[in-house]
Amino acid sequence: MNLRSAWLAAALVAVATGASAQEKVVRSEKGNLRLSTVASGLEAPWGLAFLPDGRMLVTERPGRLRYVTAGGQLSAPITGVPKVFAVGQGGLLDVALDPAFPDNRTIYLSFSEPVDGKARTAVARARLGADRLEDVQVIFRQQPAVDARHHFGSRLVFDREGRLYVTMGDRGSQRDSAQDLGTHIGKVARINPDGSVPADNPFVAREGAKPEIWSYGHRNIQGAALHPATGELWTHEHGPRGGDEINIARAGLNYGWPVITYGREYHGPKIGEGTAKAGMEQPLHYWVPSIGPSGMAFYTADAIPGWKGNLLVGALASMQVARLEIGPDNKVRHEERIAIAERVRDVRQGPDGAVYLLTDMGPGSRILRLSSAR
């Protein structure tokens, strides 16, 4: 039985046994959707990855990693997870499978690492065992560590060549460092699976620049996905009061924060020099007021009619999923907001073609499943 068939079978069993009894129909322009509960009892889940055997791996920000079955059963926490700085917005963040996972059982975790009273975004890789992580190795550490509790990022995405992108925030109090190539603050990094630097990274030969940097001038990227046709890295980042953005993170480009932004300070004043400046990229799309974006996926399946090719973005502040129709010029042609009524932390397309959501509601957080109600 292939992975898709296994997931479909498990979903049917879950419905039959009442595991998905908590469900409702939500409206969408392309047809009604069924929103059902896959699992509950999670605390601040942050990242999700689907395993070949039909289970999920889910991170919880306090520092736990669990297996979750398609029927919603939570495992005990997997041991061996690196120590995390679970304060403010810090903790255990994203999880990604190595492209060769079926052969090497290797996973990658992003997390906030405590360092002598400070903290930084870090990435570890490990071999996934039955109930523990083995051969854990930290392969990337954001420099410098900062005495701040906010804006760690962080999403992990592998490209088609097997390079790993790591998104990082400006740490809140260090916004000007997003323009400084001598730090990893407010950057997207691109590394090899062992943490070494690809020879074709854009700043490898620039004196004083961190060689891992791929793009810069970012505020706090909490959503990233590869475009299914082009293979380019699409990201979104939180603005301050307004100014959430979607960008294509391209090699060596400057995305402007905090020099340009469509947002304002939380207490009202303007930020930086305006909304545009030569040498700085404009977003493909932005939100004013903020939706609080987190998690992002391109929908490539046929299970939900009319959604194929759309970009899906979770929203913490507005408690929605934004469905964006993208034109051939990468412009957003249309946006629909689908009400979830819970803070959406992550968005993933499942092997069964349904859309899986992590909600971030503290100890009452859940995994939800969006599917066609037809």
Predicted regions, residues:
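Loop-centered beta-sheet repeat module
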Residues: 182-191, 200-229
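Acidic, Gly/Ser/Thr-rich repeat motifs that build Ca2+-stabilized beta-propeller blades
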Residues: 21-174, 223-226, 231-239, 289-327, ...
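Short, conserved, GDST-rich strand-edge loop motifs in beta-rich repeat architectures
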Residues: 166-184, 243-245, 249
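Blade/loop signatures of beta-propeller domains
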Residues: 21-34, 73, 131-133, 194-206, ...
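Conserved blade-ending motifs and adjacent loop-strand segments that build the rim/top face
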Residues: 218, 330-351
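Bacterial N-terminal signal peptides that target proteins for export
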Residues: 1-8
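Beta-propeller blade signature
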Residues: 121-131, 180-194, 248-250
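N-terminal signal peptide c-region/cleavage motif recognized by signal peptidases
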Residues: 16-18
